[in-house]
């Protein structure tokens, strides 16, 4: 393959040969979008490593679309304007919280009565099953663990994020943080060292931080029951991964 059109033709041929009209699982959904070669080289191993499950056992709706570009554009998003806050998100949040009381290492559920009395409305961003003390059982989540190290070199991988799509490599990706701001400090000077973080995906266990929900029929049914309980308590679902049990940016609002 030497031209973008040749690559496009092969992908379309593979999709046509598979003839998957109604994908029953994630594997069939991916095959129907990008064909077998791209799926097996870039999607299958990474996805099974991320979710800890065979692609055939994951629902099709997890992959709504797979952006395929036959160019050197390696951005995932298509927005015309993209960026991150100067100094990073920590600095942005610090500025947002200026003048606001912040309590760290405080569990809302363990101090619920006291904290509820502080405001007319409380935004709860924890797991919905934890809110109800796991009365109906545990929802399943995936968790993420980071191993971070400082290297005595100016450049490790030359890019902010590199995904490892094979199943054998234990981490899903390596983040080299300096490249989010072009490898320079706040004065525009080159940084002589670099910090990297290896990201590992794992099954969530109580006491760990839940990162994203495992969307399958069993969990969907259990979440529906928790959601019904929340509605009876006049809890309005908003947009946080755990609170509304969806892989989105979310929040959970309780109206008193």
Residue ranges and their predicted role:
Residues 209-256:
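C-terminal catalytic lobe of FAD-dependent flavoproteins
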Residues 77, 203, 243-245:
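A short, flexible beta-alpha/helix-coil linker loop
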Residues 62-69, 136, 248-256:
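Surface-exposed flexible segments
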Residues 102, 122, 195-197, 235-238:
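Conserved beta-strand scaffold positions in the cores of enzyme catalytic domains, especially
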Residues 109-229:
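Mid-domain catalytic core of redox enzymes
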Residues 2-121, 129-132:
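Active-site/ligand-binding neighborhood in enzyme catalytic cores
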Residues 105-107, 177, 239:
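Conserved beta-strand termini and adjacent loop/short-helix elements that scaffold enzyme active sites
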Residues 19, 82-89, 163-164, 246-253:
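Aromatic-acidic/polar surface patches that form glycan- and anion
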């Amino acid at each position: 393959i030497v031209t973008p059109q040749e690559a496009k033709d092969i992908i379309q041929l593979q999709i046509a040969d598979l003839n998957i009209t109604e994908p029953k699982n994630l594997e069939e959904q991916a095959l129907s979008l990008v064909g077998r070669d791209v799926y097996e080289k870039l999607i299958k191993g990474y996805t099974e490593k991320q979710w800890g499950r065979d692609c055939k056992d994951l629902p099709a709706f997890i992959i709504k679309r797979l952006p395929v570009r036959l160019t050197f554009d390696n951005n995932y998003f298509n927005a015309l304007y993209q960026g991150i806050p100067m100094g990073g998100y920590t600095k942005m949040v610090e500025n947002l919280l200026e003048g606001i009381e912040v309590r760290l290492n405080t569990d809302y559920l363990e101090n619920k009565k006291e904290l509820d009395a502080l405001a007319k409305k409380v935004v709860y961003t924890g797991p919905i099953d934890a809110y109800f003390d796991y009365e109906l059982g545990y929802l399943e989540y995936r968790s993420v663990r980071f191993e971070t190290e400082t290297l005595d070199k100016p450049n490790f991988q030359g890019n902010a994020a590199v995904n490892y799509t094979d199943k054998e490599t234990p981490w899903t990706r390596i983040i080299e943080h300096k490249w989010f701001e072009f490898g320079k400090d706040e004065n525009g000077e080159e940084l002589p060292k670099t910090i990297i973080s290896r990201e590992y995906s794992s099954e969530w266990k109580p006491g760990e931080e839940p990162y994203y929900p495992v969307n399958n029929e069993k969990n969907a049914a259990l979440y529906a029951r928790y959601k019904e309980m929340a509605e009876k308590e006049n809890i309005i679902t908003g947009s946080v991964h755990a609170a509304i049990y969806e892989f989105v940016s979310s929040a959970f609002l309780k109206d008193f």
